[in-house]
């Protein structure tokens, strides 16, 4: 298994690292735990300092989805979300589909409908550790991303609204970088969070957003998405109450690849990308492909 997870269902309740979780309606931080939409101010749960992160304690990751359909190749899960939940407007209908393609890819697709103008910016929060040993950090993995720049973050984790295309760490990640070297790097953004917790801008219509490689096992993961950004989180925060494979969680034990629009977009010139109007339908698809190199 190369995706971090628990051995039993109960462990997923109150799952603070959000292993494998579907995050929504809005992934990432919303500055000030509030936003304005159509002339009205909406106040959200401040669960990350003064900010709202991953839609607060009532986000989709706390919901139990029902199985709407299942075949040999895919499963579609469904849930509904009442107007005002977590402070967000709109009655939502939410479908998440997990599919296996003929090419051997895993696809995750989202479909969301609303009866009021609202915010929608979901993601999947799975962590990858290609060694399969979740008690060890991913220092011996190589990571590469075909990005158009990194969004630096403030000390509270909210991204700036400009991208950095020039710093050495940004250039290294475009070429490919051993994560042990990244975790030791003196770049102020890396030191701020002891790793990565940063959005990267992705080229529109890309065929390959990057790769994750574990040379000792030969396991090689590629990924792509219709989303315009990828938040990369390297499990910097340690919750010692979380146990995996019989041992307490260690820092940097996995890499979360969170495809979405850049967090806090509602407070930027990308606001329209996260506003879903009444009667409209939001869709997004992300694909992962794992192989073993000889």
Regions found by a protein language model. Give the residues of each.
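An exposed, glycine/acidic-rich loop-and-rim segment of catalytic or binding clefts
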Residues: 1-294
């Amino acid at each position: 298994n190369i995706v971090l997870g628990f051995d039993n269902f109960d462990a997923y309740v109150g799952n603070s690292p959000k292993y494998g979780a579907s995050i929504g309606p809005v992934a990432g931080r919303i500055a000030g735990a509030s936003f304005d939409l159509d002339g009205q101010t909406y106040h959200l749960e401040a669960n990350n300092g003064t900010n709202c992160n991953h839609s607060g304690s009532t986000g989709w990751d706390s919901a139990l989805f029902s199985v709407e359909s299942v075949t040999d190749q895919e499963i579609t899960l469904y849930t509904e979300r009442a107007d005002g939940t977590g402070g967000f407007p709109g009655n939502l209908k939410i479908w998440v589909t997990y599919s296996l393609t003929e090419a051997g890819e895993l696809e995750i697709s989202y479909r969301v409908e609303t009866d009021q103008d609202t915010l929608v910016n979901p993601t999947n929060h799975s962590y990858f550790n290609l060694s399969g040993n979740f008690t060890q950090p991913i220092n011996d993995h190589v990571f590469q991303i075909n990005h158009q720049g990194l969004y630096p973050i403030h000390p509270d984790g909210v991204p700036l609204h400009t991208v950095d295309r020039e710093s050495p760490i940004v250039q290294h990640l475009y070429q490919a970088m051993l994560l042990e070297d990244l975790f030791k790097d003196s770049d102020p953004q890396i030191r701020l969070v002891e790793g990565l917790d940063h959005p990267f801008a992705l080229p529109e219509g890309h065929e390959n957003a990057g790769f994750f490689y574990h040379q000792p096992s030969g396991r090689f993961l590629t990924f792509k998405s219709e989303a315009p950004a990828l938040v990369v989180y390297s499990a910097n925060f340690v919750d010692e109450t979380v146990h995996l494979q019989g041992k307490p969680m260690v820092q940097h034990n996995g890499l979360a690849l969170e495809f979405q629009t850049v967090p806090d977009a509602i407070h930027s010139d990308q606001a329209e990308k996260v506003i879903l109007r009444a009667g409209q339908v939001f869709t997004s698809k992300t694909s992962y492909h794992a192989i073993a190199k000889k």
